[in-house]
């Protein structure tokens, strides 16, 4: 093999070809991987601080994200919180409601500015994905949510008879659309969130029988895949059920370590409990101490029981702000791993 030498003529030729590529295909079409702008991945908050930590900072901009899980596990709630966070920062959000099930009142309760939220309710999967592509190409939208992949019905299936067998139509539709959309997403910096449902594979003896809809293309194109599950129903005495405890596993993450887990409360009619997340992190960082059922702060007992501790923080915003500031200081100084449990899995299922 011939020796590789550092020839000035090669550097000159490289500079010329890079300039030619940028003239032909636009600035940023080719760059060195170590460029500062290339290495930095900006993020937006998911609406849950514990999940932001598990993600390594939040939902990455300019990437495709898939949120999947069983019914009533919090998929849409999580997506709406992400929309609310973008709008609070002055961004533009769009919601492609393929299921035709978006509730304006619930969205408003979660902090979504429904007056400025762009909503599309397409009849076919082709129309929905074309709308997404045009929104992303405009570079004027900061986040697009598609609810859901299972509802992206191909036009041929809608126009056909109910009993017709249409093999692989949706998978081919998703594969073609993602090939087209993926590059534009990276250039625009838009966050594109696909919500997905689970199905059961028949005759599976070993491994999980669960599979997401829409084929395998989304699994490959997504930079982040979040598996959200309901693990507990929250009850309060005679009042009955008032929420659920959700667990999110980061099944795939191309911008931070994967397989981390975050848990948070979702309160019916209110969404993710911000104070619940804060209390969990405050306990893990030793800002708030717990002995038995009692929670204490600065050596003084503040409440008995977790629900009462959350209510105390809600009723005392000044104390909550102080605790949040102390928690954030500790998170910036220390490792994030203490706030995130790790799974035993070493590969994506």
Curated annotation (Swiss-Prot):
SMART domains: AAA. Gene3D superfamilies: P-loop containing nucleotide triphosphate hydrolases. It is found in: Cytoplasm. ATP binds at residues 69-76. The keyword Cytoplasm applies. One of its GO terms (biological process) is DNA recombination. Coiled coil: none annotated. InterPro entries: AAA+_ATPase, DNA_recomb/repair_RecA, DNA_recomb/repair_RecA_CS, P-loop_NTPase, RecA-like_C, RecA-like_N, RecA_ATP-bd, RecA_C_sf. GO terms for cellular component: cytosol. GO terms for molecular function: ATP binding; ATP hydrolysis activity; ATP-dependent DNA damage sensor activity; damaged DNA binding; single-stranded DNA binding. Keywords: ATP-binding, Cytoplasm, DNA damage, DNA recombination, DNA repair, DNA-binding, Nucleotide-binding, SOS response. Can catalyze the hydrolysis of ATP in the presence of single-stranded DNA, the ATP-dependent uptake of single-stranded DNA by duplex DNA, and the ATP-dependent hybridization of homologous single-stranded DNAs. It interacts with LexA causing its activation and leading to its autocatalytic cleavage. Belongs to the RecA family. This is Protein RecA. It comes from Rippkaea orientalis (strain PCC 8801 / RF-1) (Cyanothece sp. (strain PCC 8801)).
């Amino acid at each position: 093999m011939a020796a590789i030498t550092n020839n000035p003529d090669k550097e000159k030729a490289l500079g010329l070809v890079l300039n030619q590529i940028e003239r032909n295909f636009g600035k940023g079409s080719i760059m060195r991987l170590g460029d500062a702008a290339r290495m930095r991945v900006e993020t937006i908050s998911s609406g849950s601080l514990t999940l932001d930590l598990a993600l390594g900072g939040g939902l990455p901009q300019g990437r495709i994200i898939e949120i999947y899980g069983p019914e009533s596990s919090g998929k849409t709630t999580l997506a709406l919180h992400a929309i609310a966070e973008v709008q609070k920062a002055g961004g533009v959000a769009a919601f492609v409601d393929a299921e035709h099930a978006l509730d304006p009142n619930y969205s408003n309760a979660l902090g979504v500015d429904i007056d400025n939220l762009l909503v599309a309710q397409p009849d076919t999967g082709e129309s929905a994905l074309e709308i997404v592509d045009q929104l992303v190409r405009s570079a004027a939208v900061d986040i697009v949510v598609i609810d859901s992949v299972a509802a992206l019905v191909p036009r041929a299936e809608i126009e056909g008879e109910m009993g017709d067998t249409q093999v692989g139509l949706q998978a081919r539709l998703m594969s073609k659309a993602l090939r087209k959309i993926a590059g534009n997403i990276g250039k625009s910096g838009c966050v594109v969130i696909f919500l997905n449902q689970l199905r059961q594979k028949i005759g599976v003896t070993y491994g999980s029988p669960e599979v997401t809809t829409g084929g395998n293309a989304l699994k490959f194109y997504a930079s982040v895949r979040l598996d959200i599950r309901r693990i507990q129903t929250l009850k309060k005495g005679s009042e009955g059920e008032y929420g659920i405890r959700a667990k999110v596993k980061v099944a795939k993450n191309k911008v931070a370590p994967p397989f981390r887990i975050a848990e948070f409360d979702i309160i019916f009619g209110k969404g993710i409990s911000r104070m619940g997340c804060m209390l969990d992190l405050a306990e893990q960082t030793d800002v708030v101490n717990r002995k038995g059922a009692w929670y204490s702060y600065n050596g003084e007992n503040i409440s008995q029981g977790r629900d009462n501790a959350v209510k105390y923080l809600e009723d005392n915003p000044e104390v909550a702000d102080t605790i949040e500031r102390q928690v954030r200081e500790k998170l910036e100084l220390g490792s994030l791993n203490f706030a995130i449990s790790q799974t035993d899995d070493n590969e994506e299922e």
